[in-house]
């Protein structure tokens, strides 16, 4: 912002605190404000948000809307899935692309899909940009898989645990992910 070489700038941080993601990209706006104020006044500047403002101004976990169709046999074994996810990214991309990609990569969770199509839309909105958050899209994708399993069990009046076991990845077959990676490690 000021065109200064990196070695001429000193930034002191009392402590970073817990959390994940928001400190990766979303601290830049506050650093810019502090830098401009320091350049204007010639004095060191401290910028500390109170918790309410911090919660309003910084990104959160991407919320997802998902729709899916599944085909399965009478025992609850999945034959194919078609999953469409949409996430609220906020007013800028931030880390939305990799978060959404990871949600798609985790939409199988621990289950084999013989036929699969997974799509994801990144929705730009007039809200604060969502960002990296623990799980980084994984929980959103895995939740879709669990919704599918629960729906099959409910529809067929089966024990959800039995439906889960029936659809787990296999050791010698049924072990290829939707993105063509062979599952080799089993517990």
Mark where each language-model region is.
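Structural alpha/beta core scaffold segments of enzyme domains
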Residues: 1-187
């Amino acid at each position: 912002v000021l065109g200064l070489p990196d070695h001429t700038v000193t930034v002191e941080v009392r402590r970073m605190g817990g959390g994940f993601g928001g400190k990766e990209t979303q601290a830049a706006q506050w650093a810019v404000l502090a830098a401009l104020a320091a350049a204007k006044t010639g004095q060191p500047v401290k910028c500390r948000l109170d918790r309410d403002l911090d919660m309003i101004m910084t990104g959160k976990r991407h919320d997802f809307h998902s729709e899916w169709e599944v085909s399965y046999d009478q025992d609850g074994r999945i034959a194919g899935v078609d999953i469409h996810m949409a996430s609220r990214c906020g007013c800028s991309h931030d880390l939305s692309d990799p978060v959404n990609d990871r949600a798609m990569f985790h939409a199988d969770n621990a289950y084999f899909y013989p036929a699969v199509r997974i799509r994801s839309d990144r929705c730009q909105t007039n809200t604060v940009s969502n960002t990296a958050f623990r799980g980084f899209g994984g929980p959103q994708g895995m939740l879709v898989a669990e919704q599918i399993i629960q729906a099959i069990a409910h529809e067929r009046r089966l024990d959800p645990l039995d439906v889960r076991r029936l659809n787990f990845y296999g050791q010698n077959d049924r072990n290829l992910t939707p993105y063509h990676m062979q599952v080799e490690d089993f517990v």
